[in-house]
Amino acid sequence: MGKFAELTDCELATMKCVWDAKDNITVPEIVEKLKENYGLDYKPTTVYTFVKKLYDKGFVDYFKRGVKFYYPKRTQAEYIQSELNRTCEFWFDGSKTELVSALLKGESMSTEERKDIQQLIDSLDE
């Protein structure tokens, strides 16, 4: 899997709106979703700049049917995996054990979450 370009927080929120869209999405729709989902109130020209940067970085593409409709070129799962790998390499010297340990020590977990995690661990042996 190739390394993805890093995204700024604004680009990432914009990309999340594209990933979450059930269909292709326009800049005005992204503006609305950014406000609804993240409380980010950007002008359409600002969001267009974010989308242009995402296009330049290879995250989105578009087609034009009166207006530009954007769609993801990279999946959310690919990006998450890339970010987790990058975090693991940089902060934990490649140790997945240290990464998981840091994640689990950070917050308290419900009994349900503990059971789910144990099932995931048990399934690794299968």
Which sequence ranges carry the predicted segments?
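Short helix-coil junctions and helix-kink-helix linkers
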Residues: 32-42
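Short acidic, hydrophobic short linear motifs in intrinsically disordered regions
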Residues: 24-34
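A short, conserved structural fragment
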Residues: 55-65
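Amphipathic alpha-helical dimerization/coiled-coil segments
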Residues: 84-125
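Short, hydrophobic-biased segments on the C-terminal half of alpha helices
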Residues: 48-52
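Short alpha-helical segments that sit at the start of domains
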Residues: 1-17, 21, 79, 126
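Short, cationic-aromatic polyanion-contact patches
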Residues: 65-84
